[in-house]
Swiss-Prot record:
This is Movement protein. It comes from Turnip yellows virus (isolate FL-1) (TuYV). Residues 30-47 are annotated as: Homodimerization. Disulfide bonds: none annotated. Belongs to the polerovirus movement protein family. Residues 116-141, 148-169 have a biased composition (Polar residues). GO terms for cellular component: host cell Golgi apparatus; host cell plasmodesma. Keywords: Host cell junction, Host Golgi apparatus, Phosphoprotein, Transport, Viral movement protein. Poleroviruses are transmitted by aphids directly into phloem tissue. The virus replicates most efficiently in phloem companion cells and then moves through plasmodesmata between companion cells or into sieve elements for long distance transport. InterPro entries: Luteo_VPG. It comes from the Viruses. The modification Phosphoserine is found at residues 64, 133.
Length: 175
């Protein structure tokens, strides 16, 4: 059910976004007082010393249109659709982040800066990864630095443990 709800919201967002983007750029009707602004961009980053490649694709379209007073006290509606895709990879990992945003308001929408690829990759690069070691000097999970994650169902309840021939463990580093 939760997946259906998510899919329904995604479909609705997609339909609204397509509607917002359906008006071609530069097609203005002299009878209408519509304003639109479009921002698109692509950023790429390569850090050879860290073997990191990153890419960010984004687009944003904002439209301000005149509407009947019964639809908006201001007589205008402001709509924005934003899409972003970020990818970062290095030999030992690959991260992909994608999101879409749509808003509609009778008031002017605040200018939201586009996420910066360099700040995103800085976060990825500065995250220390625990090194696995078998030496006697390594810190054991019993000392509180590592904690086992428990498996949970969608509703948040902990799954019962079972004896089986295989197991999966997830560890989190606490600072």
């Amino acid at each position: 059910m939760e997946e259906d709800d998510h899919a329904g919201k995604h479909d609705a967002l997609s339909a609204l976004s397509q509607w917002l983007w359906s008006k071609p750029l530069g097609q203005h009707n002299a009878d209408l007082d519509d304003d639109e602004e479009v921002t698109t961009g692509q950023e790429e980053l390569f850090l050879p010393e860290e073997q990191v490649r990153a890419r960010h694709l984004f687009s944003q379209k904002t439209i301000s249109r005149e509407v009947p007073a019964e639809q908006s006290r201001s007589g205008r509606v402001y709509q924005t659709a934003r899409h972003s895709l970020m990818e970062c990879s290095r030999p030992t990992m690959s991260i992909k982040s994608q999101w879409s945003f749509w808003s509609s308001s009778p008031k002017p929408l605040p200018k939201i800066p586009v996420p910066s690829l360099t700040s995103w990759t800085h976060t990825v690069n500065s995250t220390p990864f625990p090194q696995l070691s078998t030496s006697s000097g390594s810190q054991s999970p019993g000392k509180g630095r590592l904690q086992r994650l428990t498996s949970t169902e969608r509703n948040g309840t902990t799954l019962p443990r079972t004896n089986s021939g295989s197991s999966t463990k997830a560890m989190v580093l606490h600072r």
